[in-house]
């Protein structure tokens, strides 16, 4: 993957305890929060792990879905399948120069060192779970915007950008 040619963004929602998933499920349902994801990723390249793809069961509509899997010969109908993040870049050529990483925990951890930015919804509650979002190093990322959304479940949506130097 050539970081100069492709801009990589992580898109995630996590609980106050960094939980992003419990088995194949997202442990919350927040009206409006999924709209942020759709707005950011529509008509873009979206990378997800195999387990996330299997929990959804189909490609994301109006997106070029790439599934990252270590399983040789893995097939995901309607999606590109790659074994490493470095193989994702060629699949972005006809879909623009932005790539959005959208679950799971291992994929986030692999992509974070290459990320230009992070779109993160932080839910103001703790949840049971077995998948966690990696810690963002304040020396590497800075908050460029943040908005708290009050509702049945309160969350803060923040945009982080990689610091230069």
Curated annotation (Swiss-Prot):
Gene3D superfamilies: Dihydrofolate Reductase, subunit A (3.40.430.10). CDD domains: DHFR (cd00209). GO terms for biological process: dihydrofolate metabolic process; folic acid metabolic process; one-carbon metabolic process; response to antibiotic; response to methotrexate; tetrahydrofolate biosynthetic process. It comes from the Bacteria. Pathway: Cofactor biosynthesis; tetrahydrofolate biosynthesis; 5,6,7,8-tetrahydrofolate from 7,8-dihydrofolate: step 1/1. One of its GO terms (cellular component) is cytosol. Its EC number is 1.5.1.3. One of its GO terms (molecular function) is dihydrofolate reductase activity. Residues 7-162 form the DHFR domain. It catalyses: (6S)-5,6,7,8-tetrahydrofolate + NADP(+) = 7,8-dihydrofolate + NADPH + H(+). PROSITE patterns: DHFR_1, DHFR_2. Keywords: Antibiotic resistance, Methotrexate resistance, NADP, One-carbon metabolism, Oxidoreductase, Trimethoprim resistance. It is an enzyme of class 1 (oxidoreductase). InterPro entries: DHFR, DHFR-like_dom_sf, DHFR_CS, DHFR_dom. Belongs to the dihydrofolate reductase family. NCBIfam families: trim_DfrA12_A21. PANTHER family: DIHYDROFOLATE REDUCTASE. Key enzyme in folate metabolism. Catalyzes an essential reaction for de novo glycine and purine synthesis, and for DNA precursor synthesis. Homodimer. This is Dihydrofolate reductase type A13.
């Amino acid at each position: 993957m050539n970081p100069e040619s492709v801009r990589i963004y992580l898109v995630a929602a996590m609980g106050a305890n960094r939980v992003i998933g419990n088995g194949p499920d997202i442990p919350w349902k927040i009206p409006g929060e999924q709209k942020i994801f759709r707005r950011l990723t529509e008509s873009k390249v979206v990378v997800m792990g195999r387990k996330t793809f299997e929990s959804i069961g189909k490609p994301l509509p109006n997106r070029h879905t790439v599934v990252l899997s270590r399983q040789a010969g893995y097939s995901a109908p309607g999606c590109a399948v790659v074994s490493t993040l470095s193989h994702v870049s060629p699949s972005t050529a006809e879909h623009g120069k932005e790539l959005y990483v959208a679950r799971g925990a291992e994929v986030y951890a692999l992509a974070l060192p290459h990320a230009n930015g992070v779109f993160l919804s932080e839910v103001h509650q703790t949840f049971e779970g077995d998948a966690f979002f990696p810690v963002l190093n304040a020396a590497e990322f800075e908050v460029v915007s943040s908005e708290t959304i009050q509702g049945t479940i309160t969350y803060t949506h923040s945009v982080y950008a990689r610091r230069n130097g």
